[in-house]
């Protein structure tokens, strides 16, 4: 589902939430690199110079934000910002050492005319990894197949939110729908899912959400889409016309069980990139944990990039800090429950995702009727370091 967000204005930073991580420490290092950090020991797990592209290109699906913290956390302090191309490039730094290659992080959204990440990956052969939602991977399976190699968030931060003053007895989406609320979204997938899971009347679906707050402020009877990592903070702290809490429930609780923005490769490049992925995937697993443990510097970079790109996307330090906290407190970034490994995919869950979303996408005409997808074609756990845990 295409992501949209309410415009954000400046706010005070929130307190950071500590998080302990479990993983191997940095490998013994040798010389100092251009980034000012020790260079990874040659041939070690953190030395990417002999196996990865000279510049590892990471493609996101939206503007700079804290949900993408693991990518931006890899960017060394020697970074440069291309304000015309909207990219940031620097030494790829992991666990305190320079890995011997550069990293370039590219945003999605208006910079690339809102094209999907899978489309961008097939247009630009230089992209190493892209953030491809599982439902998007299903949609593009026939023409632009991608294979996810690790997750970053375990559960989607997408929500439906409501006014607790209007619905004082409601604790779930189903409760609000039962009281006759109209569901305001920007697409058809969520309403179709709600029809199946909580009995939403199709007549109560409004897909004209435009990412602004005006409708919700004017009509607090609405049940509106948003992100747990943004809208609750924004509405309470940055929208003067509202200026109070909202209640919400995660869509993952009611069947929207995709992996959000897992890192994927083009299917036809998996073999070529295997030597790189054997080292890069564990680095990405640990990068998310390290970011959530201490998001301060990365959040500063994210806010700087949002300002520099000047696309109309405004992102405050307050939202960034709230997002990092919420990724932990709402259980969005957790170990895979089936294996206890952070970043690993659950085969049974992948089967459930295919079983849920193929019929929905067929009904919308996104997929032809009779589409058959083997879930194992959508992901691999081959490169996962099973010793890495967020607990």
Q: Which sequence ranges carry the predicted segments?
A:
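Bacterial lipoprotein signal-peptidase II cleavage site
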Residues: 19-37
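Sec-dependent bacterial lipoprotein signal peptides
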Residues: 1-20
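Pocket-lining segment of extracytoplasmic ligand-binding domains
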Residues: 135-136, 210-214, 219-310
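Conserved C-terminal helix/tail region of periplasmic/extracytoplasmic solute-binding proteins
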Residues: 347-391
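Short, solvent-exposed loop/beta-turn-alpha elements that line the ligand-binding surface or hinge
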Residues: 79-98, 180, 250-256, 271, ...
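Secondary-structure end/capping motifs
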Residues: 273-364
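Small-molecule pocket liners
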Residues: 154-160, 164, 259-263, 268, ...
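Short, glycine-/small- and polar/acidic-enriched structural segments
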Residues: 31-209
């Amino acid at each position: 589902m295409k992501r949209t967000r309410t415009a954000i204005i400046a706010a005070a930073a929130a307190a950071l939430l500590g998080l302990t991580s479990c993983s191997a420490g940095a490998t013994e290092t040798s010389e100092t690199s251009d980034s000012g950090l020790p260079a990874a020991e040659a041939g070690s797990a953190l030395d990417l110079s002999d196996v990865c592209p000279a510049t590892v290109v990471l493609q996101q699906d939206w503007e700079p934000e804290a949900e993408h913290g693991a990518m931006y956390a890899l960017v060394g302090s020697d970074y440069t910002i291309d304000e015309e191309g909207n990219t940031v490039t620097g030494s790829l730094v992991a666990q305190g050492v320079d890995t011997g290659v550069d990293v370039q992080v590219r945003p999605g959204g208006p910079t690339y005319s809102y094209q999907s990440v899978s489309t961008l990956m097939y247009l630009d052969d230089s992209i190493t990894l892209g953030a491809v939602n599982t439902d998007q991977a299903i949609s593009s399976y026939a023409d632009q197949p991608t294979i996810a190699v690790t997750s970053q968030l375990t559960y989607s931060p997408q929500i439906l939110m409501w006014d607790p003053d209007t619905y004082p007895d409601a604790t779930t989406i189903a409760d609000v729908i039962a009281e006759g609320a109209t569901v305001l979204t920007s697409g058809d997938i969520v309403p179709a899912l709600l029809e199946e899971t909580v009995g939403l009347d199709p007549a109560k679906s409004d897909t004209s959400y435009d990412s602004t707050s005006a409708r919700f402020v004017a009509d607090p009877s609405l049940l509106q889409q948003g992100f747990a990592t943004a809208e609750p903070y924004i509405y309470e702290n940055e929208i003067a016309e509202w200026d109070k809490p909202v209640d919400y429930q995660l869509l993952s609780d009611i069947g929207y069980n995709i992996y959000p923005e897992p890192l994927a490769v083009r299917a036809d490049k998996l073999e070529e990139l295997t030597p790189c992925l054997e080292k890069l995937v564990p680095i990405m697993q640990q990068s998310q944990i390290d970011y959530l443990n201490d998001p301060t510097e990365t959040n500063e970079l994210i806010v700087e990039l949002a300002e520099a790109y000047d696309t109309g996307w405004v992102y405050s330090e307050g939202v960034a800090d709230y997002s990092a906290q919420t990724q932990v407190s709402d259980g969005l970034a957790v170990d895979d429950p089936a294996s206890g490994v952070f970043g690993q995919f659950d085969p049974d869950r992948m089967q459930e995702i295919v079983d849920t979303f193929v019929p929905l996408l067929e009904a919308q005409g996104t997929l032809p009727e009779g589409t058959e997808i083997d879930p194992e074609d959508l992901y691999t756990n081959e490169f996962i370091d099973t010793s890495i845990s967020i607990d």
